[in-house]
């Protein structure tokens, strides 16, 4: 025989088989195994002769022909059949190699039992029964290698047999190592088989099982030290042995995977493995699946059936059965854990899970073995993770059965079961999508239980522990474990929601903008919800899932709202059924018909069966109809009577009231007899029998009934009930037996628990409302065992669910769903975290709770749920215990750290919660400050000396001082208070004790864990907050700072300092955001700046200065107003502060800022000038002087910076300067300010000249001459507009009450106009006159007019010559002179204003005030001289018409004055007698004096008007046109006529004489006035006729002259001819002047006028005289016969007659 190196020949298989055969030959017993040895030798010889490259696809052995394959493997079959371990081992080793190296190939199944491979696998399986560990391990190796081989396909029953072999090795293993290896091999086989089914391929990559995971639930006791490591290496070796072996040709694989239609997967004659499972149903379940999937399906189904085996009654404690059940469940778990998409897409696999695995879980739910329960939970978790999308209905049923039943049992739970459930929930809570899907598909499903809500409430109950006073089986350690684990689950749930939310936001970051505003509550869809009318089934309409987002956003919310309202109705029904039905009908949850209400009662889950029974038994109309409809809905046809009753009563419990039972059972009997008319004689029989059955049921199953009813008693009680006849005794006995054996009862009882737990902490945290929702007693649920009726009911539910659209599984990615989840879970989370952290000092428990708080705040904050977010943050802030530092513990410090972490991580979404966080930071700093100066403490981080000084200056106590702890503010901190109380207690009833002080100081050590870095990090991190968050942060910080500063005894500036720092940190934000921030800061600085605490106010204003200096470093672009905003607090505080120190500080701050950053100031100028304007009116002189010094520097040195900005800034500057002129402090400020205004004008002119230099083809002279309407001059107009504020300000100063200021203002105003008017355009000049110049004179005119009106209305007290009026006249005269100079200088530009100026001058002329007339005349003459060559004819006409109007208005005003003397009695004077003064009262005397004075002034005014008219005529007589002359003639004429009117009023003259005589006054010269007026008129006419005959002829002035001469002669004749005197009746006179003397005096006065008129006639030409001789000749005759007082009259008269009349007559 050849050596071992050459055994087997050159073929690949030969090299493997040869050594094994040689070893068999050596180990075999020659006598006993002769045939085996000879067979081995024969094969060895054959192998050595075979070629190496032979290929036969039909052969099962690679490299051999099909005919040789069987003979080569035959020795191994013989060796295995010997069961002799020495020859079995080499055979198994060779088989392992052949399978591992893919030498063997082909399909192995029971239908091909002649196949050598089938025989080989079967033989290997048989030797597994050998009770030797090496043999069993070798068998496991071979079977695993066969299953793993990509060239071998073990099918059907053969595969089951392989599994059974490993199964039996596990059950009968001699050692723990063997058992673990068997389990590991089985698990690895499951991976191989089901991985192939996933990919539908033989050659797949399969992961190696992890042995330690298989020992999680079972077999921990059989682990023998290094067994796990050995088994892991064992499996690894088998799996690695086949790697690298060549693959079979594709045609071989195709043959193996082919699934002929005629091939049968399962055969009736299955091996003994079928003893463990039921017979298969055939291949109808597998359909057209491939072979590998058919095998996987078969294996899965049989494993499920194996897991449903239960112990027999004879052997309840069958350990083998239990281990087999457990192993099958473990293998099912491995399969589900490693399942892929095929389980969610292949209907056969889905149905297999539903029909077999779910049934297995259902039947095992009542098993009390812990390992099985744990495996159930693990499989259930796998189903949730992998297959929840296809098992919606099943999961909805298993949740209460497996999880909630245990979770909600608080009082008497099984420790291990509950720990298993808590571990399951812990895993679930770590899968965010799973929790979301549970909520969406169950809590939002009308047909499903609120699973997530029950989970969180169950976790809350567990976290709170058993209620106080209740009995429990838990030890304190177990209870503590439950509490911690339940809290951990809630923490993980909050974390999972946050992670899911963050993930969705990251995925949809292009769709969802950041910020909590995204998660604002969705619009209500009430109109859509209202469509969900009718019964619950109406909700089962299939939603449109073509648009998932639409479903998520709208339909989900509708369904959730619908379910909540439905549950509200169900809850109301369980308390008050009638109101509940009424509510459900009104909200359209059910229809109003009895049939619909009955259907609702029958089908709706959650209704209390007892309440249903009570409602159905009511005798009211609707409940009675509903009861009838309820009963009629049952179909009792061909139903046994007891089963009918049982079926009828499964939905409700019969009421306790006999009448209600009677009504219900009467209707039941009637309906039963109607469905089964042949069952009894009448319905009465059914009624009586039903009543008897109900009583029997109560008697048999009520423990309180001691003497039970016998069958004989029952038969006897029902004699003669069938219409007098007896029912068959056998029938009644059968009824008795069935009722006694199985109780008639409801399917389930839903009793509402009543026990609730409330403690002081709940009240503190406001958790009463949350905890009141928690039921502490476990619902009285029906035991979920493996009884047939329960299984049938659940299977009916399984089958019914898919028919409803609610069974559609929804996967939601819309984060808005988190709002609904949080609404359900936030309350239990808050309660659990709060109660735990308050009651427990365990570091692990409190750390968990704080993590939960962090996660909950994150989710609620990002989702924009303000109420929930604030609740969590507030609770955390309370748990810091900073408000009661004497009781602080480590957990409170941890809470502080958590709050700081929240502030850093979720600052963007905290919004209103920032106030609580910043309050905590403030309190920390307060406590640290106290600790830093306490006797036993040193500073944690050295504070700057300045900072300490500031704090001490603001009232902080020094604890080192003796008795400092009895300081009221320190006592308040030591004694503590509620979270919302202030740190100061105004009245402390007693001193703090040394123990309290010691505890307080000791607790301050805990705060050393929180350094300044942690505190400052929150404020420094503010620069990373988004735009909305930083505004909220600043608002909150302002509130906290305000509360610090408002403390009356220990105000602090910590938050104020941090506010300033925060502003510095965020200074680089965009202006839009900064504007919003500053709106908050501005109001805060104003509030604090107005504080009564001077130190605080100074500190905040200095802080504001620092910020403003920073702001001014940033350049501001044009048309922005940010500087204006951040300087506004200075203005407000300056205007409102009552503290002179603050106002002075503001002035200094603003001065420093402006002068140091003057080039950067833009929009801030407005506030700067507003501050100085306010300072200008301050009561403190030093403030006024300080502000004026600054404004002086600004104007003098930086005027260009002002005019570079917008016009309003310059206007503010001028307004500020004007205000300084109004300062009440006398001195040079006012005058200096006015001079500065003139300086501003010079600066503006410089700006105008610069602009003019830019104009093309224009010069300064051209600008002075005229302005054209080109675009260049548009720019000039804009520049000129800067003059408006300056001129307007000076205009206002004209009305200043101080004469010197007023006069200087007028001078400067007009000097500016004179010096710089060449820059102004005509439109601008028009504006200057209308807005500035004319108002100056209007103001003066209004004053004089007012005084004049007062004097007219009350002449007795009037005085026109007061000092004020005198000054007004002087001022107005000066202004008038300057105005005329201005008009003359710029007449070309302002000639349109000539009428206005003339009107002003005329007003002066006609003014009754002393000196104004003369001033007006001189000014008018100056104007005439200045405009002599410039004014046009029309402009002269305007001047003359104004003079005429002035004269006319003078007449009217004077006549009004004269009417004031109408009430004074008129008496004729008698010569030689005195006047009795006593006849006149004081008012009359004053009136008379006033009128006399006014008459004199009136005469003077008119005389000067005549004079100015004459003067104007003389200066311009040759340039006057006819219209001008006509106006002048009218002026002379009207004045002369007025003078005659006054002089001829004898009554007036007598009154004047009387008044002047009484008061020793000179009489008004009325006569002289008349003579002078006529004389001027005559001279004017005579000169015109003589010198300007053309105009005279055009106006017929000669006729006027003759007429006026005739009038003068008549007047003279009237006073000299007695016959022409009218005789008047007079009253008695006191004294009488002789008439001759009076006439002589008047005639003498009129002589000169008469002579002038006669001479004027003589000057006429002969033709003119001849034409008018007829009119004046009679008057000459009268003059001849009149006695004259002067010889001149006859002389002139004779001359007229001789030289003029004579020639005419001749």
Curated annotation (Swiss-Prot):
Pfam families: BIG2_C (PF20252), DCB (PF16213), Mon2_C (PF16206), Sec7 (PF01369), Sec7-like_HDS (PF09324), Sec7-like_HUS (PF12783). The keyword Transport applies. Inhibited by brefeldin A. InterPro entries: ARM-type_fold, DCB_dom, Mon2/Sec7/BIG1-like_HDS, Mon2/Sec7/BIG1-like_HUS, Mon2_C, Sec7/BIG1-like_C, Sec7_C_sf, Sec7_dom. Signal peptide: none annotated. Residues 555-742 form the SEC7 domain. It is found in: Cytoplasm, Cytosol; Membrane. Keywords: Cytoplasm, Guanine-nucleotide releasing factor, Membrane, Protein transport, Transport. It is a peripheral membrane protein. GO terms for biological process: protein transport; regulation of ARF protein signal transduction. Activates the ARF proteins by exchanging bound GDP for free GTP. Plays a role in vesicular protein sorting. PANTHER family: BREFELDIN A-INHIBITED GUANINE NUCLEOTIDE-EXCHANGE PROTEIN 4 (PTHR10663:SF356), GUANYL-NUCLEOTIDE EXCHANGE FACTOR (PTHR10663). Homodimer. This is Brefeldin A-inhibited guanine nucleotide-exchange protein 4. It comes from Arabidopsis thaliana.
């Amino acid at each position: 025989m050849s050596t071992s190196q050459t055994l087997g020949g050159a073929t690949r298989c030969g090299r493997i088989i040869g050594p094994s055969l040689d070893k068999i030959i050596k180990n075999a017993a020659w006598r006993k195994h002769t045939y085996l040895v000879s067979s081995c030798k024969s094969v060895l010889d054959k192998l050595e002769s075979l070629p190496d490259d032979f290929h036969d696809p039909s052969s099962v052995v690679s490299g051999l022909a099909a005919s040789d394959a069987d003979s080569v493997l035959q020795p191994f079959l013989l060796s295995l059949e010997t069961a002799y371990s020495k020859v079995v081992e080499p055979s198994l080793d060779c088989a392992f190699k052949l399978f591992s190296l893919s030498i063997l190939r082909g399909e192995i199944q029971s239908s091909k039992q002649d196949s050598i491979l089938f025989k080989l696998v079967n033989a290997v399986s048989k030797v597994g029964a050998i009770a030797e560990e090496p043999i069993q391990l070798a068998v496991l190796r071979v079977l695993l290698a066969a299953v793993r081989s990509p060239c071998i396909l073990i099918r059907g029953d053969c595969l089951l047999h392989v599994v059974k072999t490993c199964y039996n090795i596990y059950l009968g293993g001699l050692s723990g190592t063997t058992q673990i290896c068997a389990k590991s091999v089985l698990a690895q086989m499951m991976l191989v088989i089901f991985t192939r089914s996933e990919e539908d391929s033989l050659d797949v990559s399969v992961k190696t099982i992890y042995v330690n995971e298989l020992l999680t639930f079972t077999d921990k006791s059989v682990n023998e030290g290094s067994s796990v490591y050995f088994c892991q290496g064992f499996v690894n070796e088998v799996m690695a042995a086949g790697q690298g072996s060549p693959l079979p040709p594709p045609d071989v694989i195709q043959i193996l995977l082919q699934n002929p239609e005629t091939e049968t997967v399962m055969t009736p004659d299955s091996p003994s493995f079928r003893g463990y499972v039921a017979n298969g149903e055939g291949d109808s379940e597998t359909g057209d699946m491939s072979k590998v999937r058919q095998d996987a399906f078969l294996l899965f189904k049989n494993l499920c059936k194996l897991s449903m085996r239960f112990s027999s009654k004879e052997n309840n404690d069958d350990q083998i059965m239990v281990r087999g059940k457990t192993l099958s469940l473990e293998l099912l778990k491995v399969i589900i854990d490693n399942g892929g998409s095929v389980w969610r897409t292949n209907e056969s696999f889905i149905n297999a899970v539903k029909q077999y695995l779910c049934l297995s879980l259902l039947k095992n739910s009542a098993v009390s073995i812990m390992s099985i329960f744990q495996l159930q939970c693990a499989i259930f978790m796998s189903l949730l993770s992998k297959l929840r999308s296809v098992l919606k209905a099943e999961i909805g049923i298993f949740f209460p059965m497996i999880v909630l039943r245990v979770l909600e049992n608080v009082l008497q739970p099984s420790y291990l079961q509950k720990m298993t459930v808590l571990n399951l929930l812990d895993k679930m809570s770590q899968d965010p999508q799973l929790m979301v899907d549970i909520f969406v598909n169950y809590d939002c499903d009308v047909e499903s239980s609120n699973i997530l809500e029950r989970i969180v409430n169950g976790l809350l109950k567990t976290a709170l522990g058993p209620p106080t006073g209740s009995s429990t089986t838990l030890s304190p350690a177990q209870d503590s474990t439950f509490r911690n684990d339940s809290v951990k689950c809630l923490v993980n749930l909050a974390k999972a929601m946050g992670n899911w939310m963050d993930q969705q936001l990251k995925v949809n970051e292009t769709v969802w903008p950041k910020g909590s505003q995204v998660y604002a509550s969705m619009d209500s869809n009430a109109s859509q919800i209202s469509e969900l009318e009718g019964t619950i089934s109406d909700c089962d309409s299939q939603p449109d899932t073509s648009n998932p987002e639409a479903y998520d956003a709208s339909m989900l919310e509708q369904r959730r709202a619908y379910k909540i309202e439905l549950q509200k109705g169900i809850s109301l029904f369980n308390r008050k059924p009638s109101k509940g039905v009424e509510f459900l009908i009104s909200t359209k949850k059910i229809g109003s018909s009895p049939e619909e209400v009955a259907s609702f009662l029958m089908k709706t889950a959650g209704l209390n069966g007892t309440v249903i029974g009570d409602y159905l038994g009511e005798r009211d109309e609707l409940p009675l109809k509903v009861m009838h409809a309820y009963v009629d809905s049952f179909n009792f046809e061909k139903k046994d009577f007891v089963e009918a009753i049982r079926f009828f009563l499964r939905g409700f419990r019969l009421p306790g009231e006999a009448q209600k039972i009677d009504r219900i059972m009467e209707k039941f009997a009637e309906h039963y007899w109607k469905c089964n008319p042949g069952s009894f004689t009448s319905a009465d029989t059914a009624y009586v029998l039903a009543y008897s059955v109900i009583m029997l049921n109560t008697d048999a199953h009520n423990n309180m009934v001691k003497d039970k009813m016998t069958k004989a008693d029952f038969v006897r009680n029902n004699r003669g009930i069938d219409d007098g006849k007896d029912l068959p005794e056998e029938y009644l006995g059968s009824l008795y037996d069935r009722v006694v054996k199985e109780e008639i009862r409801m399917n389930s009882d839903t009793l509402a628990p009543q026990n609730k737990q409330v403690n002081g902490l709940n009240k503190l945290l406001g958790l009463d409302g949350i905890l009141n929702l928690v039921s502490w007693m476990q619902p009285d649920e029906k035991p979920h065992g493996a009884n047939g009726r329960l299984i049938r009911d659940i299977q009916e539910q399984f089958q019914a669910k898919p028919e409803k659209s609610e069974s559609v599984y929804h996967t939601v990615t819309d984060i808005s769903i988190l709002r609904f989840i949080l609404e359900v879970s936030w309350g239990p989370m808050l309660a659990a975290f709060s109660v735990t952290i308050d009651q427990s000092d365990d570091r692990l428990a409190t750390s968990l709770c704080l993590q939960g708080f962090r996660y909950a705040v994150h989710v609620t904050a990002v989702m924009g749920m303000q109420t929930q977010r604030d609740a969590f943050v507030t609770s955390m802030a309370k748990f810091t215990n900073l408000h009661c530092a004497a009781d602080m513990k480590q957990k409170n410090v941890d809470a502080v750290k958590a709050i700081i972490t929240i502030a850093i991580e979720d600052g963007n979404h905290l919004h209103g919660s920032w106030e609580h966080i910043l309050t905590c930071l403030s309190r920390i700093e307060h406590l640290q400050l106290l600790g830093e100066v306490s006797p036993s403490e040193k500073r944690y981080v050295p504070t700057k000396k300045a900072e300490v000084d500031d704090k001490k200056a603001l009232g902080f106590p020094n604890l080192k001082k003796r008795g400092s702890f009895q300081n009221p503010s320190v006592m308040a901190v030591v004694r503590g208070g509620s979270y919302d109380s202030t740190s100061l207690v105004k009245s402390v009833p007693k001193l703090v004790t040394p123990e309290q002080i010691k505890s307080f100081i000791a607790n301050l050590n805990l705060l050393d864990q929180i350094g300044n870095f942690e505190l400052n990090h929150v404020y420094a991190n503010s620069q990373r907050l988004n735009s909305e968050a930083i505004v909220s942060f600043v608002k909150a910080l302002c509130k906290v700072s305000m509360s610090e500063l408002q403390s009356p005894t220990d105000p602090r500036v910590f938050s104020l300092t941090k506010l300033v720092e925060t502003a510095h940190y965020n200074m680089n934000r965009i202006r839009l955001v900064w504007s919003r921030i500053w709106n908050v800061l501005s109001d805060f600085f104003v509030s604090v700046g107005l504080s009564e605490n001077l130190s605080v106010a100074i500190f905040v204003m200095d802080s504001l200065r620092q910020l403003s200096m920073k702001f001014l470093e940033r350049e501001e672009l044009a048309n922005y107003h940010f500087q204006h905003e951040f300087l506004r607090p200075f203005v407000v505080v300056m205007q409102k502060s009552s503290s002179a120190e603050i106002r002075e500080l503001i002035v200094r701050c603003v001065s420093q800022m402006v002068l140091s950053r003057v080039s950067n100031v833009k929009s801030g100028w407005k506030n700067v000038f507003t501050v100085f304007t306010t300072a200008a009116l301050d009561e403190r002189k030093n403030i006024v002087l300080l502000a004026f010094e600054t404004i002086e520097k600004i104007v003098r040195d930086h005027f260009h910076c002002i005019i570079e900005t917008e016009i309003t800034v310059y206007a503010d500057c001028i307004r500020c300067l004007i205000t300084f002129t109004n300062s009440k402090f006398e001195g040079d400020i006012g005058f200096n300010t006015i001079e500065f205004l003139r300086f501003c004008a010079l600066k503006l002119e410089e700006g105008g000249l610069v602009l003019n230099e830019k104009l093309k083809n224009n010069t300064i002279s051209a600008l002075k001459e005229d302005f054209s309407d080109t675009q260049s001059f548009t720019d000039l107009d804009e520049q000129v507009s800067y003059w408006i504020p300056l001129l307007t300000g000076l205009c206002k100063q004209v009305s200043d009450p101080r004469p010197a200021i007023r006069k200087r203002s007028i001078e400067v105003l007009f000097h500016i106009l004179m010096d710089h008017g060449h820059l102004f355009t005509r439109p601008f000049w028009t504006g200057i006159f209308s807005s500035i110049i004319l108002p100056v004179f209007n103001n003066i005119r209004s004053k004089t007019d007012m005084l004049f009106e007062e004097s007219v209305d009350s002449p007795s007290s009037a005085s026109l010559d007061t000092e004020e009026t005198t000054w007004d006249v002087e001022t107005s005269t000066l202004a008038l002179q300057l105005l005329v100079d201005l008009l003359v200088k710029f007449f070309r530009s302002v000639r349109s204003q000539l009428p206005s100026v003339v009107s002003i001058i005329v007003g002066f002329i006609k003014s009754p005030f002393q000196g104004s007339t003369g001033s007006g005349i001189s000014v008018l003459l100056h104007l005439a001289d200045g405009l002599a060559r410039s004014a046009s004819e029309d402009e002269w006409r305007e001047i003359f018409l104004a003079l005429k109007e002035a004269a006319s208005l003078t007449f009217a005003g004077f006549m009004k004055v004269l009417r004031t003397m109408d009430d004074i009695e008129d008496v004729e004077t008698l010569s030689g007698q005195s006047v009795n003064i006593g006849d006149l009262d004081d008012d009359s005397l004053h009136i008379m004096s006033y009128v006399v004075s006014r008459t004199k002034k009136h005469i003077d005014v008119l005389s000067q008007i005549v004079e100015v008219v004459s003067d104007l005529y003389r200066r311009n007589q040759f340039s006057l046109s006819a219209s001008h002359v006509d106006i002048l003639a009218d002026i002379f004429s009207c004045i002369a006529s007025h003078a005659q009117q006054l002089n001829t009023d004898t009554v007036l003259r007598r009154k004047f004489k009387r008044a002047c005589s009484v008061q020793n006054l000179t009489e008004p010269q009325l006569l002289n006035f008349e003579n002078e007026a006529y004389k001027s008129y005559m001279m004017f006419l005579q000169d015109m006729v003589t010198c300007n005959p053309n105009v005279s002829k055009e106006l017929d002035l000669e006729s006027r002259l003759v007429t006026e001469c005739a009038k003068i002669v008549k007047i003279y004749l009237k006073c000299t001819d007695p016959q022409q005197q009218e005789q008047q009746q007079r009253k008695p006179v006191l004294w009488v002047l002789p008439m001759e003397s009076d006439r002589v005096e008047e005639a003498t006065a009129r002589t000169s006028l008469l002579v002038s008129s006669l001479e004027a006639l003589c000057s006429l030409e002969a033709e003119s005289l001849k034409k008018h001789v007829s009119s004046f000749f009679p008057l000459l005759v009268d003059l001849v016969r009149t006695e004259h007082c002067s010889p001149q009259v006859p002389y002139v008269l004779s001359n007229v007659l001789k030289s003029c009349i004579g020639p005419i007559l001749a």
